[in-house]
Amino acid sequence: MNFAIVRYLIGWMLGIESVFLLCPALTAVIYGEEELPAYLIAAAFSLAGAALLCHRKPKNTRFYAREGYVTVALCWLILAVIGALPFVLSGEIPFFVDALFETVSGFTTTGATILSDVEALSHASMLWRCLTHWVGGMGVLVFMLIVLPLAGGQTIFLMRAESPGPSVSKMSPRMRDTATILYAIYFGLTVLQMILLLIGGMPLFDAICVSLGTAGTGGFGNWNDSIAHYNSAYLQNVITVFMILFGINFSAYFLILTRKFRQAFRIEEIRVYLGVIFVFAGLIAFNVRPMFGSLRESFHHALFQVASIITTTGFSTVDFDQWPTFSRALLVLLMFIGACAGSTGGGIKCSRILLLGKSVKKELMCLIHPRLVRVNKMDGQRVPHEVMRSINVFVVAYAFIFILSLLIISLNCEDLVTCFTSVATTLNNVGPGLSLCGPTCNFGFFPPLSKGVLIFDMLAGRLELFPMLLLFTPGTWQRNK
């Protein structure tokens, strides 16, 4: 383990966080709020940590997969701890475990909250919650690759450790250029949504917060009734479209920008992703039609909720916990499917589901025709055995974490639906679950042990499991010989 480079990278991350903490501080100045000292103190802590860890650049800047995974896991943990300080210092969330839950939920783009009254927060804290979504959506380490001049080829380990999905492809020969392209697309879509929301009459502050939350597929909002507060079909439709857009693999946007339209529209995962959205929305629309005035209105709300859940954003226009069992079951299924690999969404990812389906089909064909030689393909290309192996290992690890978390949560929760969906929604970074943790409820009733488990699940789900698991593996901490 190259501890020097890990230390140096964490220091840079703290420096970046101190800059982001100035945004809510400025908001507190604009609105004349008392929370200003809390954000300035947190920014000072972060900057001091950066100065302490970055005072000396390491001589050996080489790092590999192990350093990449450890750096990512530690960065996100420290990021959340520092980010929780303003809530505690301001007294808006007095207990640290609750503040940590809220901040981890923000940075991991989960959107689950312990707050019963979001509207009681200051403007500064509202902005900070949504800003954590935007920062966590693409990943602070990916952003750091833009500003930090490290040895070129090795930065792929950072991006692979933090990016959602089975693999990370280069859009440019240099990973720094790839990170810049990703953030340019990310920033551009965020600004575009903000403009469209303003055109629809949404207040500027709300448009900023909603756009940041949508971009990160997070789901934090400024109102207790989420997007239903605005009571505008136009605004809800704009948010629906952008939730779907942010759930698409960003490589497709790069292909479109470089005029490779045919190649972009041939991506199998995107076709499956869009197909699932509209099929599930149609099924739910027919199922909930008696609850609404027309099929058009039922499809409007069904499409919004399907897009919100599959992209793991977590916004809501209605209390879908009151929907029929069939519709709720479909929404829970969408929690596990998730968005596309290479997007800001969570879940298992459509690409993994697609490849697992192809693997099952391959095995069935081999049983029928034992001598038949078949290979799994994606987008016309053969999928390497290593990728299929990593997907199988991921699913096993995912099932293990899910079952263990469910058992621990059930020690202090008697409602099985609440237990199951609380783990499902945090491990998949969705936000709202069903029953006691539904869209109109919160996670504040869970005891500290359960909150700790859910915090781990949110981090593990966001970082694709293995970076967090490696922290508990003794061999990870051995020095390089």
Residue ranges and their predicted role:
Residues 1-481:
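Membrane-proximal intracellular helices of multi-pass ion channels
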